[in-house]
Each structure stands twice: as C-alpha cells, then as structure tokens.
From Swiss-Prot:
PANTHER family: OPTIC ATROPHY 3 PROTEIN, OPTIC ATROPHY 3 PROTEIN OPA3. It comes from Danio rerio. This is Optic atrophy 3 protein homolog. Its main location: mitochondrion. Pfam families: OPA3 (PF07047).
C-alpha cells in the first residue's frame, strides 16, 4: 500500500484551506449587510487597526502630537470585513496546522509504543532462551557426570 506516498490528511487540509476563502468571503458579505455585525464586530477592530496604523506611520515620519481622525463608517466596515475574513482564513489555517501536528504526534507515539512493545517481546524471548540454555547446560553436565560414574566397559580383545 502506498500510504506514505499519498498522504490523504494533507490533501484534505489543503482542501479545507481552499474552501476557507469562499467561506470567509461569505462571512464578510454577511458582515457588511448586518448592522449588528457591522457595528459590534467589524467597526471596533477596523478603527483600532486604523488608529495603530496611522499612529505608526506618523511616528515614522516624525509627527508626534497629531490627532488621528477615525475612518468613516463605510470604510471602517469594509476594513473590518477584510480583517474578519483574513482572521477566519488565519484561524482555519492555524487549526489545520494544529490538527496536522496532533496527527503526526499520534503517529509518532503509536510507532514508539510499537517499538517499545517489540523490544519488550525480544527481551522476554531472550530471557526464555537464557533459561532454556541454562537448563540444557545443566542436563549436559548431569549426563557427563553419569557417563563418568559408569564403570569402564571391558575391552574385548
């Protein structure tokens, strides 16, 4: 079987990641339409992102005390929806990585358990063989002792 050459789990994860983009786009479209999503999910992160981005740019250019105007609602909703979509893709990709890591760890653990079990089996067999060797050695010594204790047979000349 060619399991190692065709890792089905990796192909499945690739499919999930490819499907995450349309899912993220649908969620972004829903976020743009829903007032609750727009006001409480999209706008606050978008305004925070805009504030941090503009503050960083201003400091790099040397302007210190400038006041940063917030984005208008439409631009903030668009930016928030984009941030939400990217976050969803990132979370799905991260989830795939975590699943792949746990799968690899389980495979590694299973292989280690099989190796430990085979080592234990070999040690048990080695112990049994050593015991058998000792028993046979004792029997050979007993036979040799009995042979030496027998009277010598008369020679027929």
């Amino acid at each position: 079987m060619v399991v190692g050459a065709f890792p089905i789990a990796k192909l499945l994860y690739l499919g999930v990641r490819q499907l995450s983009k349309p899912v993220a786009n649908r969620i972004k479209a829903g976020a743009r339409r829903s007032e609750f999503f727009k006001n409480y999910i999209c706008l606050p992160p978008a305004q925070a992102y805009h504030w941090i981005e503009m503050r960083t740019k201003m400091r790099i250019m040397g302007f210190r005390g400038s006041t940063i105007k917030p984005l208008n609602e439409d631009a903030a909703a668009e930016l928030g929806a984009e941030l939400l979509g990217e976050a969803i893709i990132f979370v799905i990709g991260g989830g795939c990585m975590v699943l792949e890591y746990s799968r690899q760890a389980a495979n590694s653990r299973r292989k280690e358990e099989e190796l430990a079990q085979s080592i234990t089996s070999l040690q048990t067999q080695l112990g049994e063989l050593a015991l058998t060797t000792e028993t046979l050695d004792a029997q050979i010594r007993e036979v040799n002792r009995l042979l030496l204790s027998l009277p010598a047979a008369p020679s027929s000349k």
